Amino acid sequence: MIFSTLEHIFTHISFSIVSIVIIIHLITLLGNEIIKPYDSSEKGMIVTFLCLTGLLITRWIYSGHFPLSDLYESLIFLSWSFSLIHIVPYFKIRKNYLTEITASSTIFTQGFATSGLLTEIRKPTILVPALQSEWLIMHVSMMILSYAALLCGSLLSVALLVITFRKIFYSYKSNNFLKLNESFSFGEIQYKNERNNILKKNYFLSAKNYYKAQLIQQLDYWSYRVISLGFIFLTIGILSGAVWANEAWGSYWSWDPKETWAFITWIVFAIYLHIRTNKNFQGANSAIVATLGFLIIWICYFGVNLLGIGLHSYGSFTLTSS
């Protein structure tokens, strides 16, 4: 009873704090000079991380096994992973481009985990025989950590694409307006006035364009490094899973739906890392591959569980309303 109460307290405290953190981050987006609210939000994420850690430890003691046996527990661990990725760079770089991504991801995953849709699987249960192994911690934790890192890196790539294509669109729109005035000959004086107005506008926006260029460069930088970290975790997770599968089922690989999509995920991000080594494909080109990887991860992690088939069917679930 006491462990259930502690779990309930940790869940609500962490969710409340991360909700406040999101609001603070939205406020700080209005200006880079607002430092105090930003520092408060970072301290809030540290408290959230500690609460999620307490939640996992409490559930571990309460259930008698490491909390990675079902979707609810994996979502809590995923939230913990997002908060970990959030606070680790904070001690080295006070402000980076991961903060908004990780904070939003934390509240999204934890909000879904604690919603009424997963009420049936929220109560701890006895592990099925296939999960009663020391490999559970190694394999599943590496896979969830890889999902967290790859999702963060992919979202940074999505942000890079949005900024890049908006920049191209506005540049194309401005150039077409100049050509339209010139071709229809509204008069030399009127044309020159319109042209000068646009040039002045572009001049005043040059600083903004420079900032966008720097932002795109930083997004590409962080995306590459976070995805590289996630790829390492994914590789370790797949290899440890293969060893565990051989011990449990007598085969390293059986092309189970979960295994197949994990392999597809690995291939997609291997392609990303490969083309990223070519300077001509850095930026938007490699970001397109990472964006595709974002969709693949959700299919691998969440979509396959909806099927409820294969050797990983113990992780399946049904959505219910409270």
UniProtKB/Swiss-Prot annotation:
Keyword RNA-binding attached: no
Keywords: Chloroplast, Cytochrome c-type biogenesis, Membrane, Plastid, Thylakoid, Transmembrane, Transmembrane helix
One CC-aspect GO term: chloroplast thylakoid membrane
Topological type in the membrane: Multi-pass membrane protein
Pfam families reported for this sequence: Cytochrom_C_asm
Role summary: Required during biogenesis of c-type cytochromes (cytochrome c6 and cytochrome f) at the step of heme attachment.
Family: Belongs to the CcmF/CycK/Ccl1/NrfE/CcsA family.
Highest classification ranks of the organism: Eukaryota, Viridiplantae, Streptophyta, Embryophyta, Tracheophyta
Single GO biological process annotation from the record: cytochrome complex assembly
Record-given protein name: Cytochrome c biogenesis protein CcsA
One term of GO molecular function: heme binding
InterPro entries: Cyt_c_assembly, Cyt_c_biogenesis_CcsA, Cyt_c_biogenesis_CcsA/CcmC
Principal place of residence: plastid
Assembly: May interact with Ccs1.
Chain segments annotated as transmembrane: 9-29, 44-64, 71-91, 143-163, 226-246, 255-275, 287-307
Subcellular location: Plastid, Chloroplast thylakoid membrane
Organism: Lactuca sativa
